[in-house]
Regions:
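Flexible internal linker/loop segments at domain or repeat junctions
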Residues: 135-153
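Amphipathic alpha-helical segments
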Residues: 16-20, 89-103
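Vicinal oxygen chelate
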Residues: 2-78, 82-84, 106-137, 161, ...
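Short hydrophobic/aromatic-rich motifs at helix boundaries and adjacent loops
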Residues: 65-66, 92, 141-142
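Short amphipathic alpha-helical segments, especially helix-boundary/capping motifs
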Residues: 68-71, 96-97, 143-147
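Aromatic side chains
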Residues: 95-96, 102, 147, 180, ...
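Extended non-catalytic domains of envelope/secretory-pathway proteins
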Residues: 86, 93, 150-151, 155
Length: 187
């Protein structure tokens, strides 16, 4: 997986991130591909830094195509939840605070009979990017540990979207063939 942040000046943002301690990631661009600066994020995932629409050179709309279609009703990303190993939540919170000037806006300590987790919710300075960081509670055998085992380490657990009409969006996505997870049984 990968993630990208849009910035005014990708080269400058990359240089600043490296100076602040981020680890650079380099890729070999193929013919007709762009070399996009990236730093190493959670689970070794690249965080690309872009300063323009990287697709504007590759795609030109036909005259009769809607340039901003309504789609299924997913308006924007609300948050990207990251699951991390026990004891690594503060490390990654500091990473986002130091490199991108994020701020912690909420802390949760969720305790359950069988599972529990702690979470720090971070937001970008403009409030447009929200990243909750989750780690297992002291029990260490809950949903976070299960995710880390199933997906071979730290990473994005889920992406939440904002919609004006959840039921309509659900119906449209289902009609387009999207498969939904089976909800857990009620207890």
């Amino acid at each position: 997986s990968a993630m990208g942040f849009r910035t005014r000046d990708a080269a400058k943002a990359f240089k600043n991130a490296i100076e602040l301690g981020a680890e650079p990631m380099y890729s070999q661009a193929g013919p007709m591909e762009l070399n996009i600066p990236a730093i190493k994020g959670i689970g070794g995932m690249p965080i690309f830094l872009v300063d323009r629409d990287i697709y504007e050179n590759d795609f030109i709309f036909f005259d009769d195509v809607e340039k901003n279609p309504r789609g299924a009703g997913l308006n924007e990303i609300d948050h990207l939840t990251h699951n991390v190993y026990k004891g690594r939540m503060d490390y990654w919170a500091n990473f986002y605070e130091k490199i991108f000037n994020f701020q912690e806006i909420r802390y949760f300590d969720i305790k359950g009979e069988y599972t529990g987790l702690t979470s720090k919710a971070l937001t970008a300075p403009d409030g447009m990017i929200r990243i909750p960081l989750n780690e297992d509670s002291d029990k260490g055998n809950g949903q976070i540990a299960e995710f880390l085992a199933d997906f071979n380490g730290e990473g994005i657990q889920h992406i939440a979207f904002i919609t004006d009409d959840l039921v309509s969006t659900w119906d449209k996505l289902k009609g387009l063939g999207l498969k939904f997870m089976t909800p857990p049984p009620e207890t």
